[in-house]
Regions:
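Juxtamembrane intracellular "pre-TM" segments in multi-pass secondary transporters
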Residues: 59-86
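Extracytoplasmic gate region of multi-pass secondary transporters
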Residues: 83-122
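C-terminal membrane-cytosol helix-exit motif in multi-pass small-molecule transporters
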Residues: 45-65, 250-254
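Helix-to-loop junctions at the C-terminal end of transmembrane segments
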Residues: 132-144, 228
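A late C-terminal transmembrane helix in Major Facilitator Superfamily
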Residues: 197-232, 240
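C-terminal transmembrane helical hairpin of 12-TM major facilitator-type secondary transporters
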Residues: 146-190
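Cytoplasmic helix-loop-helix junction between adjacent transmembrane helices
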Residues: 1-15
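Intracellular juxtamembrane helix-capping segments at the cytosolic ends
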Residues: 1, 185-198
Length: 271
């Protein structure tokens, strides 16, 4: 696809990830609550085995057309823009998945709903995530800078609302629906920030995106868990607050870089 259409193509990949979340998280939660944790793990095993077989049978061979040396790939780490992107992605993903790791517990402890209701709410989150991925491709194609800047603020506002309405299930469903859409958009934004920082090494950049995202999930889960240990489940969202406030700084630094200003001009011309 063309460079202009690349965000839309990437969003389709994230739609697949979200679709897995739509089915996987609620179904696994339901199996664990109604049968046993062991059966939930068996479900994971079966699904992964099927995916492995499908990959062998249906994913075509993709030979390398132009080799990029390891030195050339690693050289992108000399870019300040890349490091701003990496830190921003780590923080944003840490906020989203740090809290998401405890969302079921939050709904059970704070909102006080049954496990069946939790499964439905998680399904709503996953479906909203798909919608967010669809919107993300369009938003990045129209004005990437605007989408990237707004996202941390939108997520922060949503988590603040979630903290104050945690006891009311109707309000929680609405907030989680919004968070699902925003998370879908944010995932695409994060991937765009890193790959756009290193167009000369797209595969390496994509690897750095996954590394940063996973690092954020690990740290975010630990920080949100620490708030639960010290203050209670309700305050797990404070970890997301801290990560998002810090991410705003690095997103701002990222979009101020020369390459980003060039992209801004392209966005304006596109409008």
């Amino acid at each position: 696809v063309s460079k202009e259409q690349a965000p839309k193509a990437v969003s389709k990949v994230f739609i697949g990830v979200s679709a897995g979340m739509v089915l996987g998280v609620p179904v696994t939660s339901f199996i664990a609550s109604e049968v046993s944790f062991s059966m939930a793990m068996l479900f994971f095993t079966v699904v992964n085995a099927l995916v492995f077989v499908a990959t062998i049978l249906f994913i075509p061979s993709m030979p390398v057309k132009e080799k990029v040396s390891y030195g050339a790939q690693l050289s992108v780490l000399k870019k300040t823009e890349m490091w701003h992107s990496i830190i921003a992605v780590t923080l944003i993903n840490g906020a989203m998945f740090g809290f998401f790791s405890y969302m079921s517990d939050y709904l059970k402890t704070v909102t006080e709903v049954s496990y069946n209701v939790i499964s439905v709410v998680l399904l709503v989150y996953g479906l909203a995530n798909i919608v967010g991925n669809v919107l993300a491709g369009k938003l990045l194609s129209i004005n990437a800078r605007r989408s990237i800047i707004i996202m941390p603020f939108a997520l922060l506002a949503s988590y603040i609302c979630l903290f104050f309405v945690g006891e009311w299930i109707t309000a929680m469903v609405i907030i989680i629906l919004i968070l699902g859409v925003l998370a879908g958009i944010a995932s695409n934004n994060m991937q765009y920030m890193i790959t756009d920082s290193a167009p000369e090494a797209p595969d390496f950049a994509n690897g750095m995106f996954l590394t940063s995202a996973n690092l954020g999930t690990t740290i975010g889960t630990a920080i949100c868990g620490a708030f639960i240990t010290e203050m209670g489940t309700r305050y797990s969202v404070f970890g997301a607050f801290l990560f998002l406030i810090a991410s705003i700084v690095f997103v701002y630094l990222r979009v101020r870089m020369p390459h980003s200003r060039k992209q801004v001009k392209m966005d304006i011309l596109a409008e």
